[in-house]
C-alpha cells in the first residue's frame, strides 16, 4: 500500500479544506453540528495515516528483513505512531471540552498537545545537533 506524493498532497488538501469549511460553518452558527462531527475529516485523515504507518511497521516483521539496517527507522516510526495518538487524544479532549461533556480545566485539555510539541522539539534538536550522516 503506497501512495504517491501527488496523492498524499491532494488528500491532505481535500481533508483540510473540508475541515475548514465545516469549522467556518460551525463558528458562524450556520450549522448546528456537534463538534465531533466537525472533526470527522481530521479523524479520517489520521486514520488513513495510522493505517499506512502500521502497515509499514508490520512490514518489518516479514521474513527476510535484515534488522541491522533500520533500527533507527523503527524508532522514528514508533515516534510517528505516538505523535498521531497524542494528536488524537488532543482532538478528543478538545471536542469533549467544546461540547461541555466534562468540566475539565482547559490546561488539562492541552496536555497531549504540549507533550506532542515537546517531543517534536526534542526530535528536531536531536536531528539538528546529533545526527551527522
Swiss-Prot record:
It is a multi-pass membrane protein. The chain crosses the membrane at residues 5-25, 35-55, 78-98, 110-130. Keywords: Membrane, Transmembrane, Transmembrane helix. The keyword Nucleus does not apply. InterPro entries: TM_Fragile-X-F-assoc. It is found in: Membrane. It comes from the Eukaryota. GO terms for cellular component: membrane. It holds the Pfam family Tmemb_185A. This is Transmembrane protein 60. It comes from Homo sapiens (Human). The gene is TMEM60.
